Regions:
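Terminal connector regions
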Residues: 110-148
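Asparagine-centered strand-capping/turn motif at beta-strand->loop junctions
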Residues: 58-62
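Low-complexity, acidic Ser/Thr/Pro/Gly-rich terminal tails and inter-domain linkers that flank the onset
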Residues: 16-48
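Intrinsically disordered, low-complexity Pro/Gly/Ser/Thr-rich segments with frequent PxxP/GP/PP motifs
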Residues: 84-115
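Short glycine/serine/proline-enriched coil/turn segments at secondary-structure junctions
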Residues: 43-44, 64-65, 112-116
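Short acidic, flexible loop segments centered on an aromatic residue
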Residues: 64-83, 124
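Short, solvent-exposed loop/turn segments enriched in Ser/Thr/Gly
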Residues: 48-54, 118-119
Length: 148
């Protein structure tokens, strides 16, 4: 899922956005929202392998266009093992996000434990130079039986 679209529709209830994306952080008018989801069909607890997808929405509430140049993730599993991942852009793209627009993407992460956390930052550039945008820390947990 990749899209760039206007995100401030008239009358849109911001509380709804908080329900869809339970994790959010804002840096210099750029809001990063994250919604993780456990994927039981791709997981095998006996392996052990637990897989989550995470939907990220990056909203540009500022007055200038920004380009996402790189990402840095810190992934910590339930045993406290940390992995740092850095690279250019996201999902093979370095999107330009115009003022009042948003960029969405979905990616995934496997862990050997049934819980963990992720956080990090995106490096952005704009007319006023480069800056880092926080990715909110979010929790990865296997839901109770019957949940997703």
């Amino acid at each position: 899922m990749i899209s760039t679209r206007h995100w401030s529709a008239p009358g849109f209830d911001t509380m709804v956005m908080g329900l869809i994306f339970p994790y959010a952080a804002t840096t210099r008018d750029i809001t990063v929202r994250v919604a993780p989801r456990y994927l039981p069909d791709q997981s095998d607890p006996d392996a052990p392998r637990h897989v989550w997808s995470y939907h990220v929405r990056i909203e540009n509430g500022g007055s200038e266009a920004v380009q996402l140049r790189s990402r840095r993730w810190l992934i910590t599993d339930g045993a406290g093992r940390c992995e740092s991942i850095e690279g250019p852009g996201v999902i093979g793209q370095q999107p330009v996000i115009e003022p009042g627009m948003a960029f969405d993407y979905v990616s995934g992460v496997p862990l050997a434990t049934p819980s963990g956390t992720m956080d990090g930052a995106y490096h952005m550039t704009g007319a006023s130079g480069g800056f880092d945008v926080d990715i909110p820390a979010f929790v990865l947990t296997v839901p109770a039986a019957g949940g997703h």
